[in-house]
Curated annotation (Swiss-Prot):
One cellular-component annotation, GO: nucleus
Miscellaneous note of the record: Named sororin after the Latin word 'soror', which means 'sister', because of its critical role in sister chromatid cohesion.
Native organism taxonomy: Eukaryota, Fungi, Dikarya, Ascomycota, Taphrinomycotina
Gene that this polypeptide is encoded by: sor1
Protein name (database record): Sororin-like protein 1
Phenotype of the disrupted gene, per the record: During metaphase, cohesion defect between sister centromeres leading to a slight increase of split sister centromeres; this phenotype is attenuated when wpl1 is also disrupted.
Protein role: Regulator of sister chromatid cohesion in mitosis stabilizing cohesin complex association with chromatin. Antagonizes the action of wpl1 which stimulates cohesin dissociation from chromatin. Cohesion ensures that chromosome partitioning is accurate in dividing cells and may play an important role in DNA repair.
Amino acid sequence: MDSDDSFVKTAHVIETSTPENKKLSHRFKSVEIVPPSSSNDDPFGFSSTKGIRLSSINSNDLVNTLSKGFNETSNMSYNRILPSSPPTLEIGEIDYNEALQIRSADENQQSVPTVSIASPSTPELPPSSSPLLPPNGSESSSPIPLSLLSTSSLQQRKITPSNLSNTSKPMDSKQLERLIPVPHGHHLTRLRKKRRRDDDIDLSGLYETKSSSPPAIHSDEDPSYSDSIARSPVKSAFNLRKRRKGVKEKKILKTYHSQDKDTASDNDNNTGSSDEENDNLKELTPGKKEYLKSIKKYFQDVDDYQLHVVNEG
């Protein structure tokens, strides 16, 4: 303010010195020196500058036109700048350094937003006389009360099967099978297999190792053989019929070959006399005698037929 007082004193001296400078002194009377504003009332960083408002009686004077432009830039108001938004500056309206000061002052004035965790309503902050103290004893700069940080809303929610579906019922086995990951690719096996029903056939017997020895031949009259067939769970009706048929065929072929061998040996040893044949037939039962006669007749007819065909050919 010492420079301002000297400036006013010099203006007073010029006014009383010469009559030629009365016109200039008349202008200096209207000079108003505005003291610098405080930092609280100056959010845009004009505390380092001095606003000088010049007013002249003559409106057409050049000083008046310059003062209007200077007043427009120096006296920026809040009317065209919202308090929540940063100040909008036009090109050439303010210097770059002053713009940085405006930005820093605006950031300092913005209040720290209060975050609500427990409820959407804004929590009440404690008074400044009782600062918050964290567990370690140091002062806390956060305006959020520590009691709000240990709420039930911050706890992790437990995932239950009822939460996975819209209904409150627990998930059944089919729904749980959908959650099992199934690997893809020909070299990977499926983790989830089809659940076997109670009425399905037990196929474990198909994977048993079979012995190299042939199966023993049982007669149809043997009760143990029929019981073993009935108890086997893997045998189907087709396999049973096929097995029984094979057993019967083997029995017939066995008896046929044994009788055929006996007759062949008899024919080789005999001289062809009917007496020896009759003696052999006497040792046999009547049923076997008729059976052998029918076989001989059959083969004799076959031989005659072949010879007859050859003779005609």
